[in-house]
Amino acid sequence: MTDLDSSLPPSVRTAGDSWTITELVGATALGVAAARAAETAGPDPLIRDEFAGLLVSSAGPAWARLADPEQSWLDDDPHGKRAHRVGIDYQAVRTHYFDEYFDGALRAGIRQVVILAAGLDSRAYRLNWPAGTTVYEIDQPKVLEYKTETLQRHGATPAAVRRPVPVDLRDDWPAALTAAGFQAARPTAWLAEGLLPYLPSDAQDRLFEMVTALSAAGSQVAVEVFGMNSRSNAQRWLRMRERLGLDVNVAALTYHEPDRSDAAAWLTGHGWRVHSVDNRDEMARLGRPVPEDLSDEAVRSTLLRAHLGGSTG
């Protein structure tokens, strides 16, 4: 169960809704990619995602400005610039955590990867995948189409066998995944990054049930668990809308339901061995601590990884 912020706006989501890359949930993928692009272009980056800038700038000039590592669109708002920088730091740390997760999974011999709600995730292109690795990317058809076409247009090629699976995670995605060549008998490395609040609580449970059912012994899963901070979301939304004309109200795009399962508890109760870390601790460990005066505005999340049928290492 999750404590809810009563000041959050009502969700605008509807059953069966869909989107392009600049609409609804698709636009949040652009926002995350903009943070990765800004981090990559900045000094001493934690991550390197040379594809993020291409994916963001191709969506329009306002998105390209959002990816500016100097955040020049906030030059006259020092507080907003610092708060936005903390958001970039969080995305960089989150990306770094899950990059390390995949590195560990590959060292364990896993060669089958599934990225749930892949959005503009470019790991199939930018990570060093061993020969024989297949990366399945599940997301809305138009989102996957945008990524594929944009990167092809710029001459980018995947570093692994990449298999897009255009299906909504609220639908029968296991059938679509299997049709794309997924083999449940092989250990799999799953990723659910920036996903859970965009699913209804019952769909989240079904997602974990299906992931578990499709996972052979030795499989791993990594998950980001985060809630919505009404104050920080409102301020971020207003800054982007007023200065860039980008209307991306994340709180209105997520489901705020009191019966949502605790991801770590659910996985533990279904045979997974879970290791988790608070994002603030991970940010401090990597040299990107949240300034004390911005603590109330910064994201709070838990980053976790889990193994099925073995220790977490």
Swiss-Prot record:
* Cited function: Exhibits S-adenosyl-L-methionine-dependent methyltransferase activity.
Picking any one GO molecular function of the record gives: methyltransferase activity
- The name this protein goes by in its record: Putative S-adenosyl-L-methionine-dependent methyltransferase MAV_5150
Q: Name one GO biological process term.
A: methylation
Q: Give the enzyme's main class according to its UniProt record, as a single word.
A: transferase
Asked whether the UniProt record includes Methyltransferase among its keywords, one would answer: yes
For this UniProt record, the keywords arranged alphabetically read as follows:
Methyltransferase, S-adenosyl-L-methionine, Transferase
Positions contributing to S-adenosyl-L-methionine binding: D139, D168, L169
Which family does this protein fall into?
Belongs to the UPF0677 family.
> Which Enzyme Commission number(s) are listed?
2.1.1.-
